[in-house]
Amino acid sequence: MGTKIIGTGVYLPKNVLTNFDLEKIVDTSDEWITTRTGIKERRIAKEETITYMATQAAKEALREANLSPEELDLIILATLTPQKRFPSTACLVQAQLKAKGVYAFDISAACSGFIYALDIADSFIKSGKAKNVLVIGAEKLSEAVDWEDRSTCVLFGDGAGAVVVTRSEDKSDILATRMYAEGSLEELLHADNCGYIRMKGRELFKVAVRSMEEVCREVLEKAGVKPEEVSLVIPHQANVRIINALAEKLNIPKEKVFVNIQKYGNTSAASIPIALHEAIKEGKVKRGDLILMTAMGGGLTWGAVLLRY
């Protein structure tokens, strides 16, 4: 019995904030942002709530999966920007989908949230407790940044991505997962008392590259897969320098690493499902391909998922 992705969906706010727009807000420049992060623009939700964005992404994923909301057994939503303290955003999405009675909860693992949630979904399916699971990563980070702090406000964007996974008897499967957390390093990336994102970029860069390389090698070894056998790496879209350094450490050519950070910035838990959806639609992922996903986020949290699409 395997866990198969049968539908993906995204929602990206229509409002685009470019680096040139940011030049008018803080002391920065397009050149400074691009050379250090790879980001050219990001989406900013104005009227859209996180519940709305997550629901739209979920509806697209369900349509592609040819499932009705009532056929779901579980909804897991990863976010660090929930709409309310409670109830969970997953419950709000459940109501919008009219998925009456479907088990729903949020998880908080920052930028690692989506792969944490996918790991949980895989466990539910393989234990026999669920057949169809909706996994969502959604963020409204524009409400969590200090727009006077040029070191962070240039990095983040809003959006949502969703996947539907189901029990499968074919070759498609989540082959290996590994998740980690290290709370003693929380000061490297955290929210301050005002709820604004604060980070120590240089220290975080080193930890991120090393930790993601190690966990990627761990899941590859667990599955008996060599790095050169991977069809596509879909990393969390945090910083193009981190992505490039990770690819170099794993000795994986850049053409086998998916990057869309230039369009959306860092969307935290939403970044990997958005990237997966785009990679599929662009023909860069096909059935039978080996896909390696990895992320690091506040916590610190990090992990990797190896799947056969």
Curated annotation (Swiss-Prot):
Top class in the EC scheme: transferase
Spans through the membrane: none
Region entry ACP-binding, spans: 237-241
GO BP terms: fatty acid biosynthetic process
Reaction(s) catalysed by this chain's protein: malonyl-[ACP] + acetyl-CoA + H(+) = 3-oxobutanoyl-[ACP] + CO2 + CoA
One GO CC term on file: cytoplasm
Keyword annotations from UniProtKB, A to Z: Acyltransferase, Cytoplasm, Fatty acid biosynthesis, Fatty acid metabolism, Lipid biosynthesis, Lipid metabolism, Multifunctional enzyme, Transferase
Enzyme Commission identifier(s): 2.3.1.180
Positions annotated as active site in the UniProt record: 111, 236, 266
Pathway this chain belongs to: Lipid metabolism; fatty acid biosynthesis
An example Gene Ontology molecular-function term: beta-ketoacyl-acyl-carrier-protein synthase III activity
InterPro entries noted in UniProt: ACP_syn_III_C (IPR013747), ACP_syn_III_N (IPR013751), FabH (IPR004655), Thiolase-like (IPR016039)
Subcellular location: Cytoplasm
Protein family (similarity comment): Belongs to the thiolase-like superfamily. FabH family.
Recorded domain comment: The last Arg residue of the ACP-binding site is essential for the weak association between ACP/AcpP and FabH.
Function per UniProt: Catalyzes the condensation reaction of fatty acid synthesis by the addition to an acyl acceptor of two carbons from malonyl-ACP. Catalyzes the first condensation reaction which initiates fatty acid synthesis and may therefore play a role in governing the total rate of fatty acid production. Possesses both acetoacetyl-ACP synthase and acetyl transacylase activities. Its substrate specificity determines the biosynthesis of branched-chain and/or straight-chain of fatty acids.
Quaternary assembly: Homodimer.
Protein name: Beta-ketoacyl-[acyl-carrier-protein] synthase III
Natural source organism: Aquifex aeolicus (strain VF5)
